[in-house]
A protein has these predicted regions:
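Conserved N-terminal beta-strand and adjoining loop/helix that marks the start
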Residues: 1-20, 40
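Short connector loops at helix/strand junctions that flank enzyme active sites
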Residues: 6, 36, 63, 82-84, ...
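Active-site-adjacent beta-strand/loop module that shapes the phosphate/pyrophosphate-binding cleft
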Residues: 15, 72-95, 106
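Conserved Nudix-box catalytic region and its N-terminal flanking loop in Nudix hydrolases
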Residues: 19-57, 61
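Nudix hydrolase/Nudix homology domain
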Residues: 33-34, 97-136
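Structural detector for helix-capping/boundary residues
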Residues: 39, 53, 66, 108-111
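A short coil-to-beta-strand element that immediately follows conserved catalytic motifs
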Residues: 61-70
Length: 136
């Protein structure tokens, strides 16, 4: 997959108290690190369909997918580029539970993010996009 681009999506979800929905990754890449829910886009899926599917799989929650918040690219294996498009999403149903490759799922207050081991660059991206205030 040298030089290939792997399209992925993420969901930026906040509750009524301003907490972010975070998952603890259960598998590589980034096993044991906290991140927003998301993953690879399956063939034939739109970004919104992929966000909705990943949310159900990883958190048990259904969502309405909103606007594109931001985009990042990360190095993948064998020279691949992981192209991640992160979308706003609003919970419409379900019960929060960790599933699929998520070892844990929880609502986290912005001030508590610093206490978690978070995937590289996530805090900077969320801050740069205006999702978070001053550096947490």
């Amino acid at each position: 997959m040298s030089g290939s681009v792997i399209p992925c999506v993420g969901a930026i979800v906040a509750d009524g108290e301003g907490r972010l929905l975070m998952i603890k990754r259960g598998h590589e890449p980034g096993a044991g690190l906290w991140s927003i829910p998301g993953g690879r886009i399956e063939p034939g899926e739109t970004d919104a369909e992929a966000v909705a599917r990943e949310m159900i799989e990883e958190t048990g929650l259904t969502v309405e997918v909103g606007r594109l918040i931001g985009r990042v690219q990360r190095p993948g294996l064998n020279g691949a580029v992981i192209d991640i498009r992160d979308y706003a999403a609003t919970v419409t149903g379900g019960t929060l539970r960790a599933g699929d490759d998520a070892a844990d799922a929880r609502w986290v207050a912005p001030g508590e993010l610093a206490a978690l081991e978070i995937t590289d660059g996530l805090i900077d991206a969320l801050t740069g996009w205006g999702v978070l205030g001053a550096r947490q």
